[in-house]
Design a protein with these regions (language model features):
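N-terminal pre-catalytic "stem/leader" segment of glycosyltransferase-like enzymes
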Residues: 1-67
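Conserved catalytic-core segment of nucleotide-activated headgroup transferases in glycan assembly
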Residues: 10-37, 155-163, 168-240
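A charged, aromatic-enriched C-terminal amphipathic alpha-helix characteristic of glycosyltransferases
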Residues: 20, 297, 311-344
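Active-site proximal beta-strand in glycosyltransferases
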Residues: 82-102
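Membrane-proximal helix-turn-helix segments that form the acceptor-binding/catalytic region
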Residues: 96, 111-131
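Nucleotide-sugar-dependent
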Residues: 184, 232-269, 275-284
């Protein structure tokens, strides 16, 4: 039997989800855990040529956090030496479809880097993990029957909130700062944004799509488009950029239906009031007309919501203040610290 060290020790096996690791672990919890005596480190698995000997030497006795994905050889090593490690937590922000696995049954191994392979590796990570940590209630419900211990960890507020002096200016910015994964969602609003910008000369639209901007969005009046940036650069941008209105469309057939409400925190950090799709994760978070607006998929509802925020600026300013109060309430980083502090033990959960 492996003799575990008495000093709590976390190792994050980092694959390709640095932003996920930072949001849900490093930024809200690392400094405090280290101050309390817990050893915390990030092992970037793709930067090193895999060596079972090195891996065992580095990982033995540690609590492990795996975010989203991990390479096949690393998973095999953990499977073969599971008794040498402490608690394993698997942090999930995306569930690969079981249909991908079913389609591969009885066929040759899935192609490296393909979605079927990702689905297969995810199932193996579920089997390894003592606890699966999910970022949204949608994922919590979807995984309830797939793992005996599923815990919800909603996103924390990772930066300071601004003053709202920019809302006193005459020119307002309407922002959408989703990644290319949200391309289809914002495309739905192309005619809405063209219409609004045609009728309002005191607003601009900002999209973070750069060279990948779809043609359907390119003729929006007073459009500002910027290239997508790294996770770290985006955090810096959010701390400096000020918007009045943020868009968070999540349409019925969106590929992002398992998303957390991180977009609410991003919009609020930039000083904006959000317009959100009236479905999870926003429908139980936003108080319609108080700290944001909830709308359906009909473009007419998005047009009406934009007109409301642009037309009644005093009410919009009040919503922005309320959104900041809610962000402090639901995004308290101490909640995330307490979550990981309670798990900083080598004792396995099952």
């Amino acid at each position: 039997m492996t003799a575990f060290p008495t000093t709590p020790r976390w190792i994050v096996l980092s694959d390709e989800a640095q932003a996920l690791e930072d949001i849900y672990f490093f930024l809200p919890a690392m400094a405090a855990l280290r101050k309390e005596g817990t050893r915390v480190e990030r092992f970037e698995t793709r930067r090193w040529k895999f060596s079972p000997k090195l891996a065992k030497a580095r990982l033995t006795g540690a609590c492990l956090l795996i975010a989203r994905s991990l390479g096949r050889e690393w998973i095999e090593m953990l499977e073969n030496h599971r008794e040498q490690h402490g608690r394993i937590c698997y942090l999930v922000d995306h569930l690969y479809s079981s249909e991908l696995l079913a389609a591969e049954q009885g066929t040759s191994p899935p192609e490296a880097g393909s979605e079927p392979e990702a689905a297969q590796l995810q199932q193996r990570l579920f089997a390894l993990a003592d606890e699966v940590v999910v970022v949204s209630e949608q994922l919590e419900a979807a995984l309830a029957s797939l793992h005996p211990k599923v815990s919800l960890l909603t996103p924390p507020l990772t930066g300071k909130l601004p003053d709202l002096h920019h809302l006193e200016q005459s020119d307002w910015c309407i922002g959408f700062h989703g990644t290319l994964a949200h391309r289809e969602d914002i495309l739905t609003l192309a005619p809405v944004l063209r219409d609004i910008q045609t009728r309002h000369s005191d607003s601009e639209v900002e999209l973070m799509m750069g060279r990948h901007l779809p043609l359907a969005l390119s003729d929006i009046p007073r459009l500002k488009t910027m290239e997508a940036v790294s996770w770290g650069a985006f955090q810096d941008y959010c701390s400096r950029r000020r918007i009045a209105i943020g868009l968070a469309p999540l349409m019925e057939n969106s590929d992002n239906r398992a998303a957390s409400w991180l977009r609410f925190l991003d919009i609020t950090r930039m000083g904006g009031v959000g317009i959100y799709s009236r479905r999870a994760p926003y429908v139980d978070l936003i108080e319609d007309g108080v700290d944001g607006l909830l709308v359906g998929d009909d473009p007419a509802e998005w047009t009406a919501a934009l007109e409301r925020l642009l037309g009644d600026r005093d009410a919009t300013r009040a919503m922005a203040h309320n959104a900041q109060h809610k962000a402090h309430e639901v995004g308290d980083p101490l909640r995330v610290l307490d979550f990981w502090r309670a798990r900083s033990t080598v004792a396995r959960a099952r």
